Amino acid sequence: ISAALNHGIGGEVQRIVIDGRTTGLVVNISPPDTTREDLAKELGTTAYAIDEWARINRARHTLQTGFATTTPYTLLDPAHRDELFKDDDPEINWTHFRAAFPDANGIVRVSRPGIDDAARVALLYLEFQCGHECGSGRLINLALDATESWQVTSGSLVWITSPEDPE
């Protein structure tokens, strides 16, 4: 998870806010007419890693601290998140978030990584939420390098949202 977080950090990011619970199985990563082998080839991972990712993300889990990030981070407690986002108006909720975390660009949510049977390749789902009309979700492929460190090898955009064009 740390490798994916560090890979996506831009120079202007002062703090990362990470949702304190994993995403769970929030997105169908495979189109209905695609085999898992074809999906694995497209993503640059293994079918086993995809199966493992789906298996371990059936439920949400609490994240623990200890990420090795190059930027300071805050693990957002679920109760605090619920308090910040309790209003019916999404704009008000994001105003609450920005007041609580003025040095953060948004909230990162991550799945548990699915690791292949050789423990050399991993698949991770990562979302970035930056407003009520701002966010994206990606599948991140990681591999162990020669020094046994996880490195991002590729990413695939799953979804993206942005404000509508006023035209």
Residue ranges of each PLM-predicted region?
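Flexible low-complexity loop/turn motifs enriched in small/helix-breaking residues
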Residues: 1-123, 127-136, 156-167
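Short beta-strand edge/turn micro-motifs at domain boundaries
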Residues: 140-163
